[in-house]
Amino acid sequence: NRYNLIYRNYDPELINFCKINQISFLGYSPLAFGMLTEKYFSNIKANSRLELYPDYFNRYSGKASKNAVIKYLNLSRSNKLELAQMSLSYCVNKSFLTSSIIGSTNLKQLSEIIESVNIELNQKIIEKINFIHSENINPTLEREFKLYNYFKRAAKLIFDGRFFDFYKKSVKFFKKLLRLNQ
């Protein structure tokens, strides 16, 4: 299950279910496809995952996600932590996570990942993380909600026998969505 600072859809229902039923909860994407690092803030490198897989990255690149990441970045800097280390430490120290799937492309990243296991976030930092989350609850869903509402309206048009209205609205919607992704 995807689990990171900007995608915590599983708090608390699924987590409680897993605890009660002694089911492991394996988290992946603790750095939100690199969004919870500083590498996608400027000077994006050629052949980076952002360039290679832009459609996948879209779930993390909405305005709400970016705003939340900036707040987490400011928090990490004010506590003399790398954003990646704070993000990883947050996930690693969650008692319900059995493990978290990580990845690195160089030794510096691997070193930061290993070091994050030894970083214990104090209660003040945890409270600030939770406060940021309360202001930006699951910002990655911004686009998913738009798609859900689109398909809900589309189904109604189709069932009402208004297929051509559906087609015209679809073209408008996807053009707008493409503009949002640029």
Residue ranges and their predicted role:
Residues 121, 133-137, 178:
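C-terminal alpha-helix/helix-terminus motif
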Residues 76-77, 129-141, 145:
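Soluble, non-transmembrane catalytic domains of enzymes that act on hydrophobic metabolites at membranes
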Residues 143-182:
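Membrane-proximal basic amphipathic "stem/tether" segments
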Residues 1-131, 156, 165, 172-174:
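Beta/alpha (TIM)-barrel catalytic core signal, keyed to glycine-rich beta->alpha loops juxtaposed to Asp/Glu
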